[in-house]
Amino acid sequence: MIRFYGEVELVIVLMDGSDNYHISDRHCRISKETAMHFAASNATKIHGVFAARFRTSEDVMDAVLDYLESHKEFILKILKRVNGTDSDSVVFNIPLSGAGFVVSADGRVFIANRIKVVLKEDENYRIGDKARGLFVASAYPVR
């Protein structure tokens, strides 16, 4: 079990295909409603939306997976609006931990040990592949 300490924010980072996206604290204050508005009005420019706050504990992994499951439709809706397809990936960043959760659009959940990680969309998910310029350091399925 991976343990996190202190307050951790989950951030959804939506990839728009440019080289301008990155993960930063400025993305941590956007509400779900604001994210929907951004997706509608700036579909190709959205970089990140605030997703949730967790008071961390030893079972934070279960809380994260429950969150992903319960918000799956919202996540896919935003991805489809931003990218025009359901085939992209979204990064769940946990800034204070140095770990991230990666969810492919088909619902597969991965945990990664670097913050800026996107898995290449192929059947192998090979470690060391480059995806949109971000190096995939390591990742493995958790569901």
Predicted feature locations:
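Low-complexity, glycine/serine/proline-rich disordered segments
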Residues: M1-T34
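Functional cores of ribonucleases/endoribonucleases
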Residues: N20-Y21, C28-R143
